Each structure stands twice: as structure tokens, then as C-alpha cells.
Amino acid sequence: MTFMRVFAVLIFALATLGCGSDPSGSNNASTVKATATPTPTNTVPTYTYEVVNTFPHDPQAFTQGLYFHNDFLYESTGQYEESTFRKVDLKTGRVVEQRKLGDDFFGEGLTFFGNKFYQLTWREGTAFIYNADMTPAGEKRYLGEGWGLTHDDKNLIISDGTHVIRFVDPETFKTVRAIVVNREDGRPLINLNELEYINGEIWANIWHSEEPQILGRPNHIARIDPANGKLLGYIDLSGISPDDERRDKENTLNGIAYDPATERIFVTGKRWRRLFEIKVKPKQ
């Protein structure tokens, strides 16, 4: 991604992305400014992991969003003609209930907020809303791409594959504010993908982080300060599921879920055969 493209995407994101049900209607996005990123630093820590438990995962699931709720995993899977919203038994990996998206929709990020599930789509500009029992509860329209999705105590939080993360009103889908995330050397940290809000931080999977122009390190998650976009650290998950990664270069890490009651953290990837409960710890 060139500098001009990054700059253009940033301007476009802040000016137009936060629309409501009518993408052609007026909204307040033009008044929203991204929070300035702190001065670049080279002291960003890297964390590693310990596998606590391993669970089965559907190897056909092109995981794009993952959420833990009431002892079940809820998953958004992607690919045209294959995308689903599903409820999964954690221990067995069995799909308990599933809703298939239309063939023209590519499922993306997923979260649960205000007793509703929200599921983004990639380039279709549609967010699907479901009740807690997975029955449809409506749709919202937005401009731009949808990648990762999480929430804080007030807003939905959306990534679009750039280094911009937006905070969006769940009722109107208008952008309330936005942050930009830079690497420790000051360059944009692009390809921010699946998101999870954990203990006051945004954890963002970095899609294809192994690419030199992205990060040059495989299977990394960024820890981000939601107040200002400051990069708080990386989680190095390289080597966690080598067999899955070797099967296809697109079988990338892409699924983070958190159980706040027990502080369990779960990760998986696209078409991975396993889901991992991990403990994050400082890297020695």
C-alpha cells in the first residue's frame, strides 16, 4: 500500500464511512477528526503465548469474526457463496446453529452489543443485525469496506484493512471518532483486521503480518490504546498452528475471542482445524 493510498484512505474514512441506513444521506463524519498518534517510539514490547487448551475447529470455516457469549462461540465465516453466522460448541467444535448469508455477501467481523449481534460484510456495505437467539433483527448500511468488529461500553469499533479504526454509533452507524495506528517507527500499521476489546485495549489481528511491507513477522496481533491509537505492544503467535498455515497461504490467523468471566482468550484462523485457549505473557 503506497503512502498516497494510505493518505487517501484515511481522508475517505474520516469523511464518508460513518453513514447510517442511507449511505447517500448526510452524516456527521465530516466533523470527526482522528486522534493524533503519539510520538514514534522504538520501545514497543512483544508478548508471547502459552497454549492452555486446544479445541476442535471446523476446517471449512473461513473465520472472519469470533465472539464468546454464554459459554458458546459465535463465528462469522467468509467467502462468497459460503459465508455464515454460526453458533459453535466450544468443547466439540460442533455447529449448533447456523444462518447462511446470501451468495453475494462476504461475511466479516462479528460482535455482540446491546443484546444484539452485529456482523459486517466485506465490500457489500451491509451490517446484519441479529437478536440474541440469532433471529434477524435488521440491517445497517455503511460505505467502505468492513473487516474487524468489536465494541467498548458505548460504541461499535470497526477496522477496514487500513491503519484507521472507527468508533461507530450502533443505532445510526455514524462515525463518532476515529484513531490511527502507527508502527513503532512511525509508519502506518495497515491490514488491521479482526478485533477484540480486552481489558480496556483493542486487540487487532494483523492480516499477513509476515509480509515485509506490513510488519515482516508472521501471526502478530497488535495491542492498541483505544483513546489515541497508541501501539501498546505485539503478541507473537508465530508457530501456533504450522500445519494449518502450510495448507494454504490464506489460512491466516484471524479470530480472537475473550471470556471476561474467566479471562480466557481464544484464537484461531481461517480454515484452521484447531482453536486455542492461550495465556499471553512477556517475551523473554
Segment roles from a protein language model:
Residues A127-D185:
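Hydrophobic, well-structured mid-protein blocks that either form specific transmembrane helices
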Residues P59-N70, D103-F113, Y142-L156, G186-E201, ...:
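Beta-rich, blade/repeat-based domains predominating
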Residues E75-Q79, F117-E124, I158-T162, A204-G216, ...:
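Conserved beta-strand positions in repeat-built beta-propeller and related beta-rich domains
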Residues P38-Q60, L90-V96:
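A short helix->beta-strand "capping" segment at the edge of beta-propeller domains
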Residues T92-Y130, M134-G146:
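Blade-loop segments of beta-propeller domains
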Residues A15-G18:
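C-terminal motif of bacterial Sec signal peptides marking the signal peptidase cleavage site
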Residues V88-G93, N131-T135, D169-F173, D225-G229, ...:
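Short loop/turn segments that connect beta-strands within beta-propeller blades
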Residues N53-P56, V96, K100-D103, A178-L189, ...:
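Surface-exposed loop and turn segments in beta-propeller and other repeat-based domains
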